[in-house]
């Protein structure tokens, strides 16, 4: 597998790692070494869909200076993943759909982040986790379809005029 010298985006799905939407590398799994190599690039976007990424595999990305858009969908992340994102000064979009073990208790780690959009669809997010999300000062949109958030939980965040929770009737 030949890696390019530079990359701005990385996307892994179905065993294929795509760098900058054009360089395709066969990668049936994402190893710790691959994650370290990817974290070495000046990426602005990183997305993985359908691979059991763990909190530990994310650690090389801690403090990534240019990351704007980060997504792990249908992975194996927990609330312990949030400190990794807390030191990404340009992070605006955090997509964590389908990580069932995320409850929201780790969200206070993002208190100083500039995240505009947080997607937590199909996670274990509950009312307490939603309150943690609502306390993030720069968060404007949160998606929470197919979570444990109740109507009462939504009402508890109603006083926060800045945040716009998005949930569809289920």
Residue ranges and their predicted role:
Residues 4-8, 12-36, 41-170:
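Concave beta-strand-loop units of leucine-rich repeat
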